[in-house]
UniProtKB/Swiss-Prot annotation:
A matching Pfam family: Ribosom_S12_S23
Lineage start: Bacteria, Pseudomonadati, Pseudomonadota, Betaproteobacteria, Burkholderiales
Region described as Disordered: 104-124
InterPro entries: NA-bd_OB-fold, Ribosomal_uS12, Ribosomal_uS12_bac
Biased composition (Basic residues): 113-124
UniProt-listed CDD domains: Ribosomal_S12
Name used for this protein in its record: Small ribosomal subunit protein uS12
One Gene Ontology term, aspect cellular component: small ribosomal subunit
Length: 124
């Protein structure tokens, strides 16, 4: 703990802000190839089988990212686009995979919030 005199002479060191998605390295998205696609269970009090994938990114980081929406066509060696954004009830999952981009298709028969799930506009 510095004294008031020390603070007057030197000033306080500025606190560095730690990124919530370090692996992105200030990029909006990163590309990667799935090495493992699996399901995991959320922490209490929720219960489900959440779909996640382990993805080594082009910058060398290996991240666990969430596959949103109902159903997906991902498997090992699928090329995906990863964005930041954590899943609150899955510890260690701090990234999302972008639907409708590269090898991951959009959600089928999606009518609302289509842009978030890469779904095309339905025909009349």
């Amino acid at each position: 703990m510095p004294t008031i005199n020390q603070l007057v002479r030197q000033g306080a060191x500025a606190e560095t802000i730690k990124s919530k998605s370090a692996a992105m390295e200030n990029s909006p998205q990163r590309r990667g190839v799935c090495t493992r696609v699996y399901t995991t269970t959320p922490k209490k009090p929720n219960s489900a089988l959440r779909k996640v994938a382990k993805v080594p990114l082009t910058n060398g980081f290996e991240v666990i990212s969430y596959i949103g929406g109902e159903g997906h066509n991902l498997q090992e060696h699928s090329v995906v686009l990863v964005r930041g954004g954590r899943v609150k009830d899955l510890p260690g999952v701090r990234y999302h995979i972008v639907r409708g981009s590269l090898d991951l298709q959009g959600v089928k028969d999606r009518k609302q919030s289509r842009s978030k799930y890469g779904a095309k506009r339905p025909k009349k």
